Swiss-Prot record:
HAMAP family on file: Pterin_4_alpha
Keyword set, alphabetical order: Lyase
Lineage: Archaea, Thermoproteota, Thermoprotei, Sulfolobales, Sulfolobaceae
Name of the protein in question: Putative pterin-4-alpha-carbinolamine dehydratase
Family membership: Belongs to the pterin-4-alpha-carbinolamine dehydratase family.
Amino acid sequence: MSGISSKELEELKINGWIVLENGKKIKKEFRFKDFKQSVDFLKDIQPSADALDHHPDVCVYYNRVVVELTTHDVGGLTDLDYKLAIKLDELYKMKTS
């Protein structure tokens, strides 16, 4: 497990991820048409998270899902956070296209 590069972090910021806690965590809000789409997205997160053995903190609201990523073991961001963030962005694009 390696740290996240500044280039990777910039890529995530361009895609709407917000850096929190002095670079120890990233957060993004995904917006949907309704609660069903929000819950469906949550269900889609699970296989990707399991495949990486890396699980996000998630809050589900009526028409949005807020995801926070960090690697608790190291107290900051790693390549696992980057990979899962990219995957979640891909899932979101597929769901909303």
